[in-house]
Regions:
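Extracellular TM2-ECL1-early TM3 structural module of rhodopsin-like
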Residues: 11-23, 49-112, 118, 162-166
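Helix-to-loop junction signature of class
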Residues: 22-26, 63-82, 97, 101-108, ...
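Alpha-helical transmembrane segments of multi-pass membrane proteins
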Residues: 26-29, 56-68, 133-149, 169-173, ...
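Intracellular effector-coupling site of seven-transmembrane GPCRs
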Residues: 59-60, 182-235
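Fourth transmembrane helix
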Residues: 63, 74-77, 100-113, 117-160, ...
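Seventh transmembrane helix
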Residues: 175-181, 219, 227-240, 250-299
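Non-transmembrane, juxtamembrane loop and terminal tail segments
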Residues: 194-206, 284-307
């Protein structure tokens, strides 16, 4: 049965479920992203290159949870009231989602390269990766992210523009993949070196601790990248195959899955990273100060100490 032009084509039960889902993700995601930004801003030892990149990704995610998701809730309410002006609201949400998604992917790419550099060349990373440089990278990231909504607004049916978008996404994932492979190879090589240093207990212990941190770095990045991929690939596929009615159920729920990624990201960091959990406790007044035994000597890895 055809859907009313004044209602999203997901049925009354679907609208109720969607309202609950979007409201929950909007509240939980906004709180999580705000907490990430605040703990990095208020904790000096988290203000590293990695920390600033994570905060930038939280800003991009906050755009989704605090703007796009409330717009979707508003749209669902208008559907119940049988008013016919939600199309404009959805299009605005779509443009903001494109902008935020591009910023997230570019930031995730920069974060993957930074972590690979920190693991494979820690001394060079410490000397070369500065906050000034990363702020320039972040500024360029937001400028580049404007390309997607601009293309959607003015060159929607342009084939070259679509190819450029596709190549951009593939290029980012290629960089992330190469960075991940190099990181894993370095961690495995470290394991072999530890096994060969059985006569030097002091070096074995220090190297083993570094190797463990590096493994956790790889795991954390793998979780974040995998979640991003699983959430966004379905809707990207639906858009690429050009389903005739882009307002159908499949498009709506796959889009919801993609947007949900912005609500989940901050809680991944709090779950896996001890430093972030402790900083959050301080922020909420549950803990007076960070314990000294959690301080990590190597600034390149300090924001990725995990469970």
């Amino acid at each position: 049965m055809a859907s009313s032009p004044c209602k999203l084509p997901i049925g009354s039960a679907g609208e109720i479920v969607a309202m609950v889902v979007y409201t929950s993700f909007a509240i939980g995601g906004s709180l999580g992203n705000i907490f990430i930004i605040l703990v990095i801003y208020r904790t000096p030892r988290l203000k590293t290159v990695c920390g600033v990149l994570i905060a930038n990704m939280a800003v991009a995610d906050l755009m989704i949870t605090s703007i796009v998701m409330p717009i979707m809730v508003f749209t669902l309410v208008q559907g119940f009231l049988k008013l016919c002006f939600y199309d404009t609201a959805i299009y605005i949400a779509f443009l903001i989602a494109l902008f935020s998604g591009a910023a997230s992917l570019l930031t995730l790419t920069a974060l993957s390269v930074d972590r690979c550099f920190a693991v494979c060349r820690p001394m060079k990373h410490k000397a070369m990766a500065t906050l000034t440089k990363v702020k320039v990278i972040i500024a360029k990231t937001w400028v580049k992210s404007l390309l997607l909504p601009i293309v959607e607004l003015f060159y929607r049916d342009s084939v070259p523009a679509k190819y450029i978008q596709t190549l951009g996404v593939i290029g980012c994932y290629a960089i992330i993949l190469v960075s991940g492979v190099l990181t894993i190879r370095n961690v495995r090589a470290s394991s072999s070196r530890i096994a060969a240093m059985h006569n030097d207990q002091g070096r074995v212990r220090m190297t083993a601790e570094l190797k463990q941190r590096n493994k956790q770095v790889a795991k954390t990045m793998a979780v974040v990248v995998t979640l991003f991929t699983l959430c966004w690939i379905p809707i990207a596929f639906v858009i690429s195959v050009k389903i005739p009615d882009t307002q159908d159920r499949i498009f709506f729920w796959f889009a919801t899955l993609g947007l949900a990624n912005s609500s989940l990201n901050p809680w991944i960091y709090f779950y896996r990273q001890i430093n972030y959990r402790e900083a959050l406790k301080m922020l909420l007044g549950c803990k007076k100060s960070l314990s000294n035994d959690r301080v990590i000597a190597d600034p390149s890895n300090e924001t990725l100490e995990t469970k």
